[in-house]
Amino acid sequence: MARRTVLVTGVNGFIGSHAARAFHGRGDVVRGLVRQGSDRRLLGDLPLDLRHGDITDRASLDAAMPGVDVVVHLAGLASDHGPWERFHAVNVVGTQLLAASAHAHGVRRFVHVSSASLHGFAGRRHMTEDMPMPVSPYAYVESKRQAEQWLWQWSQTSGLPTVVIRPGNVFGPDDHTFLLQYVAAIRNGQGGYIGGGRAWTCPTYVENLTAALWLAAEHPAAVGEAFLVTDGLDIDWRTFTERLCEALGLRRPRLSIPYWLGMALATALEGGYRLVGARRAPLLTRYRIQNGGRDYHFSIDKIRRVLGFVPPFDLATALQRTAASMATARPAAPGAASGDAVG
């Protein structure tokens, strides 16, 4: 069978670099879209066909697209802080330009990585793909919602074969954003829980996610469908944190604040940061408080049933691998942008 050429946007980011390894390991030719001068350390010596480009620049996308069979779209602005205009330009318009270029060049499948956060923080467990995706007060979430909504309409009119993946809270080796910040806070005695850590969460180990991405790019039944992807666990934040601390050899956090207090503090902090025009997010944001203080949990029954997905790594292995990578890692600034789409 002829080898496919898979274009991965955001290839030098956390999820993108893992996706590149996964597709290369299965025999695909991986073409990576990277911005000029961007950090490529996560790619190591992986043999890739790197192309300079930007998802907001149609000409650069057209230059990278000839010969591509599958697009895996991971590039985006992923942060809980920043102006709407930036999120719209990158996450909405960038997706539109990429999909249009893929269609113009005869791409056979377009795998769009969205976010489980589109379903909101409704305090529910076992949420499914057909549940509402309300307008969000958070620029990141709303931009991903609008991008996915547009993409479904475009795929119907253009005929572009499209699959959407909505991951939960992604973690794993080389994650220098949220999880590393959380661990740094625990090390410093500042980490803790919202409401005692009893809200259910949706850990999504990055190599489990890339296994789902491969199925989305390969399985004939995937086209035209959206799939939620997590590790499939019924787990709360306290249990996840305790398992994480055990893997890292850290003392478990003892601090906890009520949900209402967390929201009040986050609202005040965000208002103050906006007032002074701060570019970085405060340590507490409403997004983070809702993510950690309300049930935010999803069923993966659909992807199990339709694509035969089974998460290949259990939580113990995932945390061991993640802990090993954190020995020398330094956290990014709070609210830092990422080359990946995250939950």
Which residues does each PLM region occupy?
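N-terminal Rossmann NAD(P)H-binding glycine-rich loop of SDR-like oxidoreductase domains
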Residues: V6-R26
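NAD(P)H-binding glycine-rich loop region in Rossmannoid oxidoreductase-like domains
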Residues: S38-D39, L48-V92, S101, L118-F121
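Catalytic helix-loop patch of NAD(P)-dependent Rossmann-fold dehydrogenases
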Residues: A89, G123-V170, G191-G195
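A conserved pocket-lining segment of Rossmann-fold NAD(P)-dependent short-chain dehydrogenase/reductase
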Residues: P132-P134, V164, A184-T204, N208, ...
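Glycine/proline-rich active-site loop of Rossmann-fold NAD(P)-dependent oxidoreductases
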Residues: R145, S158-L160, F171-Q181, E207, ...
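Conserved C-terminal active-site "lid" loop/helix of NAD(P)H-dependent oxidoreductases
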Residues: V206, E242, L265-R274, R279-F309
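Mid/C-terminal beta-alpha module of Rossmann-like enzyme folds, strongest
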Residues: L215, H219-L283, A316, Q320-A323, ...
